[in-house]
C-alpha cells in the first residue's frame, strides 16, 4: 500500500518514501511526540488481508523488539491504522553494504571490522532464538557507528508455535519476489540461500553463518 507524503499513520507523519522490499514499503517519518525521525515499514494491503502474512508481520515485530544490540536496527513500535499494519524502526543514515561492494573490494581492516560486528549481532540474535534467514549486503547498512543489520522480515522465533507456521508453508519458488513467504515461495533471497533452504528444509543459526561467509567473500573481492 502506498502512503501519501504528508499523511499520518497513527501518530507518525510521513515525510518521504525510502524504498520497498518483500514485506512492503518503507517510509521516512517523524514522531512528533518525541521529535524523532523514524523509518516506518508498511505491509501491502494485498498482503494484510491474508492472516498468514499478518501473523508473519507481527512475528517480525516481536522478533526484532527482543533484540537490543548496537549492530541491529532497533524497533520502536508496531501498529495498525485503518487496516494498515506498520512497523516503526530506527532511521538509519548511510549506504547499504551492497552499494559499497558495487564500488569494489573493501580494505581488509574494514572487512574484518564489519565481519566481527555482523558476527556479534548474529550471536545475540541466535542466543535469543531468532534467525535472520535473509542475510545479504542489501540488508546491512553502513552507519557512522558501524554496520547495522536490518529487515528481519524472514526472521523466525525458534519456538514450536511459530515454527509450525513456517513449516506449513510451501517451498516451491515463483518468479515473483523471492523474499516473500507464502504458499508457493521460498524463505530467503536465492543467491544467499544455504543448501537446506534451497531444499526446503528448516533454517537455523547455521543458515545465517553460511550467508555471512558469502558476505565476507563479497566484501573482500568486490
Give the positions of each predicted feature.
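Conserved ATP-binding/catalytic core of the eukaryotic-like protein kinase fold
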Residues: 1-222
Amino acid at each position: 500500500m502506498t502512503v501519501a507524503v504528508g499523511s499520518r499513520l497513527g501518530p507518525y507523519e510521513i515525510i518521504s518514501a525510502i524504498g520497498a522490499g518483500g514485506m512492503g514499503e518503507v517510509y521516512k517519518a517523524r514522531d512528533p511526540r518525541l521529535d524523532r525521525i523514524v523509518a516506518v515499514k508498511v505491509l501491502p494491503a494485498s498482503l494484510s488481508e491474508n492472516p498468514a502474512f499478518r501473523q508473519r508481520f507481527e512475528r517480525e515485530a516481536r522478533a526484532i523488539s527482543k533484540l537490543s544490540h548496537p549492530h541491529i536496527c532497533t524497533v520502536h513500535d508496531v501498529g495498525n491504522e485503518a487496516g494498515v499494519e506498520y512497523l516503526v524502526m530506527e532511521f538509519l543514515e548511510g549506504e547499504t553494504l551492497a552499494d559499497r561492494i558495487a564500488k569494489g573490494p573493501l580494505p581488509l581492516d574494514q572487512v574484518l571490522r564489519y565481519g566481527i560486528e555482523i558476527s556479534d549481532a548474529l550471536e545475540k540474535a541466535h542466543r535469543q532464538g531468532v534467525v535472520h534467514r535473509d542475510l545479504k549486503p542489501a540488508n546491512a547498512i553502513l552507519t557512522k557507528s558501524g554496520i547495522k543489520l536490518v529487515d528481519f522480515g524472514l526472521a523466525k522465533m525458534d519456538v514450536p508455535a511459530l515454527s509450525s507456521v513456517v513449516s506449513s508453508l510451501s517451498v516451491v519458488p515463483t518468479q515473483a519476489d523471492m523474499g516473500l513467504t507464502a504458499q508457493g515461495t521460498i524463505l530467503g533471497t536465492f543467491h544467499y540461500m544455504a543448501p537446506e533452504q534451497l531444499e526446503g528444509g528448516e533454517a537455523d543459526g547455521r543458515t545465517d553463518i553460511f550467508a555471512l561467509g558469502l558476505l565476507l567473500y563479497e566484501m573482500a573481492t568486490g
